[in-house]
A protein has these predicted regions:
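Short, acidic/small-residue loops that bind anionic groups at enzyme active sites
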Residues: 80-103, 198-216
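A short, acidic, amphipathic alpha-helical segment used as a generic capping/interface helix at domain edges
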Residues: 161-179, 192
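N-terminal glycine-rich phosphate/adenylate-binding segment common to multiple enzyme folds
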Residues: 47-94, 179-191
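Glycine-rich, highly charged phosphate/nucleotide-binding loops
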Residues: 40-58, 161-169
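Conserved beta-strand elements of the Class I
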Residues: 107-110
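N-terminal glycine-rich anion-binding loop in soluble enzyme alpha/beta folds
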Residues: 1-49, 113-157
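C-terminal functional extensions of proteins
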Residues: 186, 190-192, 206-225
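A generic secondary-structure signal
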Residues: 54-58, 62, 99, 168-176
Length: 225
């Protein structure tokens, strides 16, 4: 997990109630939200990748059955972290995209920062070059409560306002792509608002909990929102 202090309600990847059974959380010190989102390429160099790899090895040594991360932008570390351990590693919900694109002409992605989620992330998730344009990315308002609290790593967050930001982004995506059926939540802090997104847009909403390697561990708050 990134080193954070913002609230994590049920459904958030960092809330213990989001998972079934025993869950071990390991914080990678020195890696905060902005590091992952706005300098993601830098994560593949220097001490941060080494710290994530070491944390993954420690979790594996403790007997975990699978490992995930707390930020979808960390898909850029997918290969390196999987190479570091033998247990399944799921860095991001974006790994769902190739299978979805095989059955649907377009798939939506809701992200905390549309300005920085680019083709490199989609390619690393396995999206074929010819289908990059079929991924419809929509970000929350960069000046809204959701982005402010999480990217700013603020200990205080108005959850109702944050939820409205996420739903507003989903509605904007629906307006851009009225025939879109499915949306993937890049941000692991968005699942608490999944049901509100469904109610507002009719989208099928998928998240980290829907990745096959993690699905059996996901609890109801993360599945339904």
């Amino acid at each position: 997990m990134l080193s954070t202090r913002f609230p994590r309600p049920p459904g958030d990847v960092g809330h213990p109630g989001s998972w079934r059974g025993d869950t071990e959380f390991r914080v990678v010190e020195g890696a905060g939200p902005r590091d992952a989102v706005r300098d993601a390429a830098g994560l593949r160099e220097g001490p941060v990748l080494a710290a994530f790899s070491a944390a993954a090895r420690e979790l594996e040594a403790n007997g975990v059955g699978a490992i995930t991360t707390s930020c979808g932008f960390l898909v850029l570390l997918q290969e390196a972290l999987q190479d570091a351990v033998k247990v399944p590693v799921v860095t991001s919900s974006l790994l769902l995209l190739p299978a979805l694109l095989a059955r649907e002409p377009q798939v939506g992605v809701l992200t905390i920062d549309a300005r920085h989620l680019g083709d490199a992330h989609l390619r690393q998730a396995g999206v074929p070059p010819g289908q990059l344009a079929d991924v419809m990315v929509e970000g929350v308002d960069p000046g809204g409560e959701f982005a402010r609290a999480i990217l700013g790593n603020d200990a205080a967050m108005d959850l109702a306002r944050a939820g409205r930001d996420v739903v507003a982004a989903a509605r904007a995506l629906r307006g851009r792509a009225p025939r879109l059926r499915t949306v993937v939540l890049e941000c692991t802090n968005m699942p608490p608002y999944a049901q509100a997104i469904r109610d507002a847009t009719g989208f099928e909403v998928l998240s980290l909990a829907d990745v096959p390697a993690l699905k059996s561990w996901a609890a109801e708050p993360m599945i339904r929102g």
